[in-house]
């Protein structure tokens, strides 16, 4: 029998009162006896600290603090230590007789928080002779010792041979070592486990029934069914993994589309760029060659343009020089025309002014006559006015006389007024302000004499005027004519000059008559001269264009030669046009054929790709469409055979799965109904009783029981009878055996064992012979062996089924691929390759383009020659009619001679035209110039002055006469106011006076009117004279200007000048037009040269850039090709059908794929970075790197155990097949993995029954425990009503709740929680998740309710509570509960610890004075029966009969406090024996 481990001693080093004290512990009870403050609690605290060194748990409170929520600040530990290093060590010996010292080093930490530093350690291999105090202390002298620090202790122990020292950094490691060595009963894995252990120690230390333990008895007493829970967790993990795998498969199936999309878009992205670069490389090569051809052509064109530019520049310089002369000639001709036109206008003005002068002279003579008549009428009017005045005066005098007679005063008054008025008028007219009535007579005589003198003088001058007027007018006329012709001269020279002018006029008229014939002759000669000059210019131009000088005699022969050349070139051009049309037609046909082939090529290439893929997939070569259809028939036959074989393997695999499921049922029952019946009958399946039968004995027992191997063993058959009535849900044959399931044996049968068989004597007349089965299924070992073989067979069948399924799906997909090929590509797949024909046609097209180019060059040269010949013929056609003019050398001299004669004639005509009229007028009156009447103007002025003097004298004399006649009236001033009435005679006189005054007024008005009219006539006459003089002056100016112009203004002069100007203008225009043409041509030539130069530079730059680009691209392309070939992706990227797309289409295709790829790789950082780097257009190899990265990314996701290929495209095809197979397999696996709800209920019920039986056994050990009135203690275990209902529903009504357990969204734990909530809606689940609740429901401990009951006196069994028991009874009851807990822990941990170790059992009891002697004796008995150590702290009056007792007395010596300890072992039958130890005080 295995000995139980024991605690040998407890050592305290440097504790309060204990410097170095070792307490040897008794094998049963160790009692610490002493008064208050003796150190009992300190000793126990040191033991607990060494046992559980967790400062978060340690709390040493006094008994009075029991139940308090808070204690002292240091939790009772800091105050129990002394300053410096402290130790608490436990010396133990385990079941293997190994000595192990475990302990802790404690040290107070300075500070107000009163903290303690704890370091656990362990010592192994220590010799039995070495005491713990010797390890940690060093003796200085007889009365002094020193405590060793932990590092010195470590060094000291390492120096000892065979001794192991371990220091722990975690409490978990410390407790793990103590559990493995059998020091503690339970493995303390976590802080929760340490807390339970501490609560147990604390409960035992302070005694009583601990509410912390009784409230959680399930956690302390019921072991965690980790196996069942792990099975559930494994099952759920498998289901979860299976569902996650299914979900992953679904995700993978969706990712498969993503992968296909990724591969497709990556291929499009990279292949489009790859083919675009390939096309661009070819295009760049073609462009480089084209640039080189254009470069050479442009150089030739530039040289030709430079030669052409030199010729045109030379011709332009000649035209520029000629243009200056022509402009000067044209300007001179224009000026001459302007002068002629001006002279003609001047001549017209002169003629118009001469006509105006003649008209004005006539009008002037007429106006003179009118003025003379008006003067005569004016004199008559004046006489009539004077008569009217006399009559009025007479009537007035008569009226005055008569008035005087009637009224003297009135008459005098009137006369006076009239006299005053006359006097005033006389003063005014005579300019005599001092004139008076008295002096008027004297002045009258003076003015009458003056009037008479003036009249005589006027008459004398009038007579002289009439005589000189006629002679004066003729002389002036003749003199003015001479002045007009010859210019200003003296009047005495007029006669001689006039005669000379008349002779010159006769000569000029004779010359003027020759102007017209000379002008006509000159015009004719000038026209011929111009034609001769034009012919010379044309000939010079022609020679210059031909580049050779020709004589006049050679021109006709040259004309014939050029016409012959034109005819031959015209035929050549016509033939060249036809030849070009034939070449163009052939080129168009080739282009059309190439276009058709290029449209067919991608379709043919796609068909070839599909055909090659089919050939690779099936490993066959197809040469015609018939081969494809024949292979398709073979494929269909192969598919049918594979499907049949797959179905057979699947059926066998399902059978094996069913057998495995049947054998895997809990309890070894193959029929689930037997488990329900066994539970219903209160029995046990026979297979459960023989569950642990060995594999060797399984055939025997299987044959022994035969058909009854599935029987139910019940305690009493009579109690089952009532259950059999109406039983229908059971197997056809139900066997029941009466017996005790706990002690069942096979003695119920009489059996004889044979060779590999048995004979069972069922009754006297009935035997059964049963052979040993080849595959026994009785017992767990046999079932597991059979299940293992079935699993192996199932693996083979699954692999074969997977292979067949894969082959079937592969065949089906191949069939679909063939069907798609036949529908899409069969019509064109076996046609000839169009690309060789395209290459051949392209080479022919290049030849045609070259031929067309050469033909165009030849045709261009012929066209130039043709145009040059046509221009030469046109020029000769203009020159040949003028050959006679070219030969006439005297034409220019004749023109000059006629021009001189014409100038003389035109000068004479101009003189006759200018002065002909004046000479004609001068000729009849030239004789009057011999005498000059110079005094006529002076006479005329004197006459006018005498007339004015005569009129003034007459008016003055009249005014003075009137004053003299009224001189007597001045004395009537006093009668002015004395008026009276008039008579009839007075009225008549007055009327007659009025008539006379009216007549006088009319005469005056008439006089004034005639005077105004005379004034008008005089004004008209003056204006006519002024106009005549002005026009005469203007005429003289015009004649002088015409002479200054110096141009003959005849009728044909303007026409000749205009013709000359127009001819020069035409020549100038032609010259300018040609110059402009040359300038434009030169500008165009320069522009063309500039363009050619720029084009040449650009071509050179483009050629060298393109050449460099081709060279660079070649290196880059080589790198790309090397990378493509190294990674084996050329077949994927070199898609020949893309070669027929344009660069824009390929770029668009690549850009679209890039946009799709950005979305596809957005979640993959590596691919996203590689894709971003690949977007650099200058680094095409990065796109290949991206493509390789995509392939590598997909290869990494290929499961090589499933898909045996490195090609992601093929892998995706295989993946589709494999995923569908895996989906089917995992779905069936999930159905098999999912444990039934009935099985769960059975497992939980069986576990509950097992634990109830274990608790029942534990209760048997407590039946005889008694404390005071408590006669017995037991644990009552019941199933909770809500959980029992859950188990019933799971086992019997699970069909109603399959919506929970069949849901793919819920795990079994979650479904169980949902069912619990459905059954108990009144229970509040709080914030816990269904998964947490379900995991709790899978733990059988949550189904049980546990409580402690005591049998106390007459009350019988009642719930153990502190309030219902005395203190001693509570302590005893609590101790009993703790013993049960420790025993339960040992049972639970037995399978975790080595089988050769039985752990130490030790509990505490402080303040044991509350127990009576009977209770203490019961504790001793309990410790002895359970091999448990107990440490009791009791006052001095307690003296146990057994065990070891320590008496502690705390003393003070020289201000030093220490505890005096005396140990006693047994005192009743034996003498007291002092235990080892000393009372030394600390130094």
From Swiss-Prot:
Region feature Flexible hinge, mapped onto this chain: 666-783
Q: Where in the cell is it found?
A: Cytoplasm, Nucleoid
First and last residue of the signal peptide: none
Q: Does the keyword Cell division apply?
A: yes
A GO molecular function held by the record: DNA binding
Q: Which domain of life is it from?
A: Bacteria
Name where it mostly resides: cytoplasm
Coiled-coil spans in chain: 326-418, 444-480, 509-601, 780-804, 837-923, 977-1115, 1209-1265
A Gene Ontology CC term for this entry? nucleoid
Biological processes annotated in GO: cell division; chromosome condensation; chromosome segregation; DNA replication
Binding-site list for ATP: 34-41
Keywords, A to Z? ATP-binding, Cell cycle, Cell division, Chromosome partition, Coiled coil, Cytoplasm, DNA condensation, DNA-binding, Nucleotide-binding
Q: Which SUPFAM superfamilies match?
A: P-loop containing nucleoside triphosphate hydrolases
**Quaternary data:** Homodimerization via its hinge domain. Binds to DNA via its C-terminal region. Interacts, and probably forms a ternary complex, with MukE and MukF via its C-terminal region. The complex formation is stimulated by calcium or magnesium. Interacts with tubulin-related protein FtsZ.
Name the family the entry cites: Belongs to the SMC family. MukB subfamily.
> Which NCBIfam families does the protein's record reference?
PRK04863.1 (NF003422)
Known function: Plays a central role in chromosome condensation, segregation and cell cycle progression. Functions as a homodimer, which is essential for chromosome partition. Involved in negative DNA supercoiling in vivo, and by this means organize and compact chromosomes. May achieve or facilitate chromosome segregation by condensation DNA from both sides of a centrally located replisome during cell division.
Question: Domain remarks in the entry?
Answer: The hinge domain, which separates the large intramolecular coiled coil regions, allows the homodimerization, forming a V-shaped homodimer.
Instruction: Please state what the protein is called.
Output: Chromosome partition protein MukB
Say which species the protein is native to. Shigella dysenteriae serotype 1 (strain Sd197)
Organism taxonomic ancestry: Bacteria, Pseudomonadati, Pseudomonadota, Gammaproteobacteria, Enterobacterales
Q: Source gene?
A: mukB
